[in-house]
C-alpha cells in the first residue's frame, strides 16, 4: 500500500493521474475515435436481437451490449452508466460527467472532482479540483494533459493542443516532474510525450509538479518539528494502518488509503484504494508502490516478496567520516546543502535566463527528485564537459558549500569527503554519493530508508 506520505491521495485525483498515461499500451496522438470502422478487432458482427439499450459515459445510447463493446474497443475509457437509454440523448460527455459527479458529490465521504462545461457542452480548457486547489489543462475530450497541473493558480492553456508545434527554444526551461506518472502507466512503460499529451505553454512557470510531490510535501511537513532520530524511524505496516485509520476517522472526506498488512509488520504485495477501484503492487517491507503496476477493477499480478534493495552495505559514504564536522552533524549538513541545491535548481529553471546559459535539459523521468538535483548541479560545475569536476571547477563548489550549508565546520573538508578515490577530481557518482542521493527513494545513502529530516524544499516552489 502507499506509505503514509502519499496516502492522502484523493480518489478522483488518482484517476486524473491515471488518465495522464496512455491506456492499454496504445500510443496514439489523437482521439481513439479515429480508428477505422474497417478495423476487424473493433468491428465485430452484432446479431439482430431484441434491443437492450445501454447508456454509456460518452452520453450515447447503444442498442445492445455488442454495439457498446464495439465502441469500447475504439475508446477503452468508455464505461456503462446504466442500463436503458440515456435520459438526455443529446447530452454532451462533459455535461453527463458533470451530472454524475454532482450526484456523487452528495456523499459526504467523497472529495469529488466536478468538471466544468462550456455553453456548447464541451469541456472548458482549464479544469480544477476545488478541494485541493489543483488546476490543469484538458483536451477537447476532457482528458488531462500531462505536464499542466498547478496548485492555487490557473495554468496557461494556450490554443488547441494539436494546433501548436512543439517548441525547441524553451525546452531548457520546461521540466515535467512526473515522478508519479509511471505508477499508473497501464502497460508498465514510461510516458511518451506526444502532440496530445505534451503541449507547450506560454509563460515561465515550471510545468506539472505531480501529486507525488504534493503528498511528499504533506508528509515531510509533518516532520519539520521532529528530531532527526524520530524522522529516521521506519514504521511498520501495522503502525501506518493505525495512523491511516485515525486520519480517515478525523478526515472522512479525504479518501485516505488504508494499507493492508501481512504478519510481521509487512505490507501485503497488492494494495487497493476501495473508493476508486485501483490496485497496485508494492514492496512488502516499505509499502512503496511499484511503477507500472496500477490496474482498475482487476487484481494486478505482483511478486509475493518484493523488497527494497539494501543500499547501506554498498554505500561507501554511509560510515565515511567528514573531517572537522561535529559528531552527529553530518546528516544535518548534507540535508541543508541538498535543500539549498534544490531551491537553486528550481529558481534556475523558473528564471527567464537560467544559470549556465540555459544548459538545463529535460531530465530523465525515471530519476528521483534528488537525482535530478545532483545531475543538474554536476552539469553546472562541469564547464568543460569532461564528466568530472577538476580542481579549477571545484572552487565555486567549495564557495557554494561554505555559503549555503550548515553547520559551517562541516564545509571545510567536504570536497575531500566527496573525492572517494582521492584522484583530485569528483565524478558524478561521487557527487551523488556524498550528497546521499540514491536511486531507491531519493536520499538513501546518508538518510536511512529515504526519509530526510526537515521541511520538503519544494513547498511553495513547485506547487
UniProtKB/Swiss-Prot annotation:
Residues 36-88 form the Kazal-like domain. Disulfide bonds join 42-73, 46-66, 55-86, 94-117, 128-135, 137-157, 237-261, 272-279, 281-302. Keywords: Basement membrane, Calcium, Developmental protein, Differentiation, Disulfide bond, Extracellular matrix, Glycoprotein, Metal-binding, Repeat, Secreted, Signal. Disruption phenotype: Null mice present with a phenotype resembling human microphthalmia with limb anomalies. The phenotype includes aplasia or hypoplasia of optic nerves, hypoplastic fibula and bowed tibia, and syndactyly in limbs. A thinned and irregular ganglion cell layer and atrophy of the anteroventral part of the retina is observed. InterPro entries: Dev_reg/Prot_inhib, EF-hand-dom_pair, EF_Hand_1_Ca_BS, Kazal_dom, Kazal_dom_sf, SMOC1_EC, SPARC/Testican_Ca-bd-dom, Thyroglobulin_1. Pfam families: Kazal_2, SPARC_Ca_bdg, Thyroglob_assoc, Thyroglobulin_1. Glycosylated. Probable regulator of osteoblast differentiation. Plays essential roles in both eye and limb development. PANTHER family: SECRETED MODULAR CALCIUM-BINDING PROTEIN, SPARC-RELATED MODULAR CALCIUM-BINDING PROTEIN 1. This is SPARC-related modular calcium-binding protein 1. It comes from Mus musculus. The gene is Smoc1.
Amino acid at each position: 500500500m502507499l506509505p503514509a506520505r502519499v496516502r492522502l491521495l484523493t480518489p478522483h485525483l488518482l484517476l486524473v493521474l491515471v488518465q495522464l498515461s496512455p491506456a492499454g499500451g496504445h500510443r496514439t496522438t489523437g482521439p481513439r475515435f479515429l480508428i477505422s470502422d474497417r478495423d476487424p478487432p473493433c468491428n465485430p458482427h452484432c446479431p439482430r436481437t431484441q434491443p437492450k439499450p445501454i447508456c454509456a459515459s460518452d452520453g450515447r445510447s447503444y442498442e445492445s451490449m455488442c454495439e457498446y463493446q464495439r465502441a469500447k474497443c475504439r475508446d477503452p475509457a468508455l464505461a456503462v452508466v446504466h442500463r436503458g437509454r440515456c435520459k438526455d440523448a443529446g447530452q454532451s460527455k462533459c455535461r453527463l460527467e458533470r451530472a454524475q459527479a454532482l450526484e456523487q458529490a452528495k456523499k459526504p465521504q467523497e472529495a469529488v472532482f466536478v468538471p466544468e462545461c462550456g455553453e456548447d457542452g464541451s469541456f472548458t480548457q482549464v479544469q480544477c479540483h476545488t478541494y485541493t486547489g489543483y488546476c490543469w489543462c484538458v483536451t477537447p475530450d476532457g482528458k488531462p494533459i500531462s505536464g499542466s497541473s498547478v496548485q492555487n493558480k490557473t495554468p496557461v492553456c494556450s490554443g488547441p493542443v494539436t494546433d501548436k508545434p512543439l517548441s525547441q527554444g524553451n525546452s531548457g526551461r520546461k521540466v515535467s516532474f512526473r515522478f508519479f506518472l509511471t505508477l499508473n502507466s497501464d502497460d508498465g512503460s514510461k510516458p511518451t510525450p506526444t502532440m496530445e499529451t505534451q503541449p507547450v505553454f506560454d509563460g515561465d512557470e515550471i510545468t506539472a509538479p505531480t501529486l507525488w510531490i504534493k503528498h511528499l510535501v504533506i508528509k515531510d511537513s509533518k516532520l519539520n518539528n521532529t528530531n532527526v532520530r524520530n524522522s529516521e524511524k521506519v514504521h511498520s505496516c501495522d503502525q501506518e494502518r493505525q495512523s491511516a485509520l485515525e486520519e480517515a476517522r478525523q478526515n472522512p472526506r479525504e479518501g485516505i488509503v488504508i494499507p493492508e498488512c501481512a504478519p510481521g509488520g509487512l505490507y501485503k504485495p497488492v494494495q487497493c484504494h476501495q473508493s476508486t477501484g485501483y490496485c497496485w503492487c508494492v514492496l512488502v517491507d516499505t509499502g512503496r508502490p511499484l511503477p507500472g503496476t496500477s490496474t482498475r477493477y482487476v487484481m494486478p499480478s505482483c511478486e509475493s516478496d518484493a523488497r527494497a534493495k539494501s543500499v547501506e552495505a554498498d554505500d561507501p559514504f554511509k560510515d565515511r567520516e567528514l573531517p572537522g564536522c561535529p559528531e552527529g552533524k553530518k546528516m544535518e549538513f548534507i540535508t541543508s546543502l541538498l535543500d539549498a541545491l534544490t531551491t537553486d535548481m528550481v529558481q534556475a529553471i523558473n528564471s527567464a535566463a537560467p544559470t549556465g546559459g540555459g544548459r538545463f535539459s529535460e531530465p530523465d523521468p525515471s530519476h528521483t527528485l534528488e537525482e535530478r538535483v545532483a545531475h543538474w548541479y554536476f552539469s553546472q560545475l562541469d564547464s568543460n564537459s569532461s564528466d568530472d569536476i577538476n580542481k579549477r571547477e571545484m572552487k565555486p563548489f567549495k564557495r557554494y558549500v561554505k555559503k549555503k550549508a550548515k553547520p559551517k565546520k562541516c564545509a571545510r573538508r567536504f570536497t575531500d569527503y566527496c573525492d572517494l578515490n582521492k584522484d583530485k577530481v569528483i565524478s558524478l557518482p561521487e557527487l551523488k554519493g556524498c550528497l546521499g542521493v540514491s536511486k531507491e527513494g531519493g536520499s538513501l545513502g546518508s538518510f536511512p530508508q529515504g526519509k530526510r529530516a526537515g521541511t520538503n524544499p519544494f513547498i511553495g516552489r513547485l506547487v
